[in-house]
């Protein structure tokens, strides 16, 4: 399937499985008359594959060492993208950032690394399913930067276009999206 055909097919899947109308309160606290819940698309075999392939194709030439983001939305995305990257011969390892470190066991804030691995000095792309103001992604970015990671890009599946681009620019981050919310409205 061509890139444009894959993109069109994924838009259909997101519209059917993950887009809805009705008043909701977003993670940012804002009210909206439409919403995206990408988890049904991320858990669908075709949807997950298309999300991963299109994201991988957008990132493959940028030289990233790791891909990940804040739990929960980034977990299936990062795993699927890592798998596709290995299949395509250009591995990008995955991780995820906990909203708060575990209070037992190793008490980690960043999961997916071995005891000997570090993100210090590594090129990281933060990925998320839906971005509104950028607050959730910035939590991950802050944790990663504290760990010494070089975070330069936030990549989202759907940008609601409600201030995230400006917030990321102010933090010295590039921002890219597979889709803009207006493509579904």
UniProtKB/Swiss-Prot annotation:
Orotate binds at residues 132, 160. Signal peptide: none annotated. GO terms for biological process: 'de novo' UMP biosynthetic process; pyrimidine nucleobase biosynthetic process. Keywords: Glycosyltransferase, Magnesium, Pyrimidine biosynthesis, Transferase. SUPFAM superfamilies: PRTase-like. Its EC number is 2.4.2.10. Its cofactor is Mg(2+). The keyword Iron does not apply. Pathway: Pyrimidine metabolism; UMP biosynthesis via de novo pathway; UMP from orotate: step 1/2. One of its GO terms (molecular function) is magnesium ion binding. It catalyses: orotidine 5'-phosphate + diphosphate = orotate + 5-phospho-alpha-D-ribose 1-diphosphate. Catalyzes the transfer of a ribosyl phosphate group from 5-phosphoribose 1-diphosphate to orotate, leading to the formation of orotidine monophosphate (OMP). This is Orotate phosphoribosyltransferase. It comes from Bradyrhizobium sp. (strain ORS 278).
